[in-house]
Amino acid sequence: MGTLSFALAAAATATAASPLHTALKAGGGTMCFARSYDDAWLSNHKGQTVREARFLVTTSRTSGRPMLRLKVAGNGAPIYGYGECAWHDGDLNRGGQNDILDATFKPTTGVGCHLYTDVDGYSAEEGGDFPVEWVDGGQAIQAHLPDSLAGWRSLDVSRNAAFHPLGPADRIIRLKLAPAAECDELLRRFAPAAEMDDI
C-alpha cells in the first residue's frame, strides 16, 4: 500500500463534525467494534486464520483526535496495533500521490486509519494506512487491512512495533459496534496513557 497524507487529512477534518466524531461523542468518546469467528466459519473460509478482532476508537483527551487501538488474534500471540483515524469525504483510499491504496476497496467516503510503530511519536518509521467502510451509520465497519500489519505481539510497547504479514483471507474484517466492555483490555491495558498529541 502507498502512504496516506494522513497529517493533512486529519487536520482538515478535525474542525468539522464528521459522522465519526458525532458517533464518538454519542458514545461518550469511546467506540468498540468486535468480531469473533467460530470453527464452522473458518472451515468454510479456507486460508483465514483470524479468529477474533477488536477495534477501539477513543477521543484523545487533549487533541480531540480519534485514536485507534486494535487487536487481531489468530495463530500464535495476538497482534496489537496503535494509531489514529480520520473521516474522509470523497478522498478515502487515496495515497499522497493520489494513488489507490487498496484496489479491492470501493467507497470514497469513510474512515482512513494510520498505524504507528511506537506509542510516543518518536519513531520515523510509518506503520501503514488502511481504509475502513462506515456501515449503517457506524453500527458496523469493514476494515481492509494492509498486507503487513504494524503491531506488537504482547501488551509490552517498550520497543517499536514489528510488521506481521497478513494473508489475503485475513485482510478484510467486518466488525459490529459492541459494548465498550468488549474492548476493555485495549482500553485499560494496551498503552493506556498514549495520546500522540505532539505529532
Give each language-model segment a name.
Residues 27-65, 126-135, 177, 196:
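Short, solvent-exposed loop/hinge segments that bridge or flank secondary-structure elements
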Residues 1-9:
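Bacterial N-terminal signal peptides
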Residues 29-30, 82, 110, 180:
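Disulfide-stabilized extracellular ectodomain repeats and their linkers
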Residues 15-32:
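N-terminal helix-cap/turn-to-beta initiation motif at the start of protein domains
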Residues 122-199:
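Glycine-rich, aromatic-bearing surface loops/beta-hairpins
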Residues 65-145:
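Contiguous, well-ordered beta-strand patches that form the walls/edges
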Residues 44-90, 146-152, 164-171, 182, ...:
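N-terminal glycine/threonine-rich, aromatic-flanked beta-hairpin/loop signature
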